[in-house]
Amino acid sequence: MSKEKFERSKPHVNVGTIGHVDHGKTTLTAAITTVLAKVYGGAAKDFAAIDNAPEEKERGITISTSHVEYDTPTRHYAHVDCPGHADYVKNMITGAAQMDGAILVVAATDGPMPQTREHILLSRQVGVPFIVVFMNKCDMVDDEELLELVEMEVRELLSEYDFPGDDLPVIQGSALKALEGDEEWSKKIVELADALDNYIPEPERDIDKPFIMPIEDVFSISGRGTVVTGRVERGIVRTGDECEIVGMKDTTKTTVTGVEMFRKLLDEGRAGENIGALLRGTKRDDVERGQVLAKPGTITPHTKFEAEVYVLSKDEGGRHTPFFKGYRPQFYFRTTDVTGAVELPEGVEMVMPGDNLKFVVDLIAPIAMDEGLRFAIREGGRTVGAGVVSKIMD
């Protein structure tokens, strides 16, 4: 184990492999850890260890995912790889594995296939910001022109879904040959790592983003005023900051006159911390669970949006029967349920358990939201689906 591993001073970037079944995602994942461990230090993981992905639960949904990590001289990467197509769908929609960028694996022997397209579309819908392409199995294609043709096809497909197909990096390689230790093909893995370093920008840390805290509880403290508690989702709030209370009803302004944690007064509350914020001039009844406390002007309330959704299968504890247009479940955002009506897309009559689709939701009360916000779909407190806001409409 190299000492490098525990250096947390390097920026941390989350990536993952996506692409069609059997195009070599897991082999590539193994090759990256193996080659980079040799070149830069770190731990190699073999194919079997990655392929045997443990099951995890995210919002009540079982997802099989493998997590590996590796280092380049300038960064530390956390990388996810999923065994099955359904796991990718669930992973990307629940946000279980938030990706700062994805490695799209396309076999040069096949070119783009149906799941290639599906994963690119999903990436677009759930807000994966950057894609780097690894054309795999290039050792099996002798014809230079054929390789060029496949690369062109992949670039066109990415452009179709509003990724910069002409400009993004495409590396031609062979994961298996690199994994077997072939020197020339191993260089392609290092080239891929360089592409990740140079093409995927360093993600903005949660703490540097504008302040937002979902409100979980509201108390009234006599002589001091109203306190709201919750876990700071992003940013920093300081004593004296003006904030907005957004969602459920009209947005109101307030000032934070104190921040406390474990009954101690602090100057500030930061992303990831559970805090209580004392609000000046805000009455106990003006605030409720489900609203957010946020930096003014950074988030707005909405009722109508388009969502990319995964509906739980019966085996996952979901519905046993399909639902139809006019379906009105609860949508659980951050800390609360809001009823909403589902508008199915043209030509879709019913939705079966286990389906993945996009539809429009109209909520009965506004929720503070941005595109990319995750939610659960519930019926009487039981999770029956998961979704992500792909487009705000109203």
From Swiss-Prot:
Q: Which residues form the tr-type G domain?
A: 10-204
* Gene3D superfamilies linked to this entry: P-loop containing nucleotide triphosphate hydrolases (3.40.50.300), Translation factors (2.40.30.10)
Q: Which domain of life is it from?
A: Bacteria
Q: Name one GO cellular component term.
A: cytosol
> What EC number(s) would the UniProt record show?
3.6.5.3
Q: For GTP, which residues are the binding ones?
A: 19-26, 81-85, 136-139
The UniProt entry, under PROSITE patterns, shows: G_TR_1 (PS00301), G_TR_2 (PS51722)
Q: Which UniProt keywords apply?
A: Cytoplasm, Elongation factor, GTP-binding, Hydrolase, Magnesium, Metal-binding, Nucleotide-binding, Protein biosynthesis
> Where is the stretch described as G3?
81-84
Please list the reactions this protein catalyses: GTP + H2O = GDP + phosphate + H(+)
Q: How does it assemble?
A: Monomer.
Q: Which function does this protein serve? A: GTP hydrolase that promotes the GTP-dependent binding of aminoacyl-tRNA to the A-site of ribosomes during protein biosynthesis.
Q: Which family does it belong to?
A: Belongs to the TRAFAC class translation factor GTPase superfamily. Classic translation factor GTPase family. EF-Tu/EF-1A subfamily.
Q: What is this protein called?
A: Elongation factor Tu
